[in-house]
């Protein structure tokens, strides 16, 4: 059974441990993410979810364990190597260039994906090939009509959409999304759910998220983390009715919703 699970996985995490002082942020975490669809990781604050994503992206090195992506260990690979291998990450806090336009941000992401250094002093906006590719990604997230706007002048939700477009510009096999709904309003959340549903039909997504409505709408598989450990992984329906999950995180009302 484990061999079949591993064979079907684009991402296979084995016994991942990371401690900060005496605190175990990830404690013997093992997880298999199947190719295609959306796998969400949920849990209370301090459960280790963001630390897990940081280890997967290469931002933080684990103390022990292994990470296999697309059949190869990436444990010793840096962030840039993992990105080139097909892992793209968005952050819990927006990480866009606020004084540049939406299109310029997307073009810089395309440029980075093509292996070129960011040409901050060059007239990037005059490169039509870059612009065309960038506009395709902006269209995917519904920002093509806002491409000329300065990022600081648009809503937080639109900045989150831009982050997704920039991640897509990396031509990833898998997206690592750290709370894509964080800080955005109800209407923008609905829009992001629509976007991620479309993206998830084409790409594998591993997503950390606190918005349970969004998680239940999007996820094909759910993993629940508590105190640095994965206590359950299953379908949404089975997670919602899991007594241990209800006791540790969701609360008894979720099974009745």
Residue positions per predicted region:
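Glycine-rich phosphate-binding loops of nucleotide-dependent enzymes
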Residues: 2-257
């Amino acid at each position: 059974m484990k061999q079949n699970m591993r064979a079907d996985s684009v991402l296979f995490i084995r016994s991942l441990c990371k401690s900060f002082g005496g605190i175990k942020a990830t404690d013997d975490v093992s997880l298999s993410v199947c190719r295609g669809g959306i796998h969400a990781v949920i849990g209370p604050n301090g459960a280790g979810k963001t630390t897990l994503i940081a280890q997967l992206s290469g931002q933080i090195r684990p103390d022990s364990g292994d990470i296999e992506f697309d059949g190869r260990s990436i444990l010793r690979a840096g962030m840039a190597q993992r990105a080139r291998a097909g892992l793209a990450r968005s952050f819990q806090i927006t990480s866009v260039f606020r004084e540049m336009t939406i299109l310029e941000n997307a073009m810089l992401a395309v440029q980075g994906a093509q292996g070129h250094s960011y040409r901050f002093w060059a007239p990037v906006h005059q490169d039509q090939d870059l612009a065309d590719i960038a506009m395709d990604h902006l269209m995917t997230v519904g920002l093509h009509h806002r491409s000329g706007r300065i990022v600081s002048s648009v809503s937080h939700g639109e900045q989150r959409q831009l982050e997704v477009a920039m991640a897509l510009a990396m031509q990833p096999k898998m997206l690592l999304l750290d709370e894509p709904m964080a800080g955005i309003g109800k209407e923008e959340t609905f829009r992001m759910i629509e976007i991620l549903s479309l993206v998830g039909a084409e790409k594998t997504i591993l997503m950390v998220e606190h918005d349970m409505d969004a998680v239940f709408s999007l996820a094909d598989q759910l993993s629940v983390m508590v105190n640095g450990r994965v206590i359950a992984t299953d379908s949404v329906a089975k997670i919602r009715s899991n007594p241990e999950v209800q006791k540790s995180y969701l609360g008894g009302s979720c099974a009745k919703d």
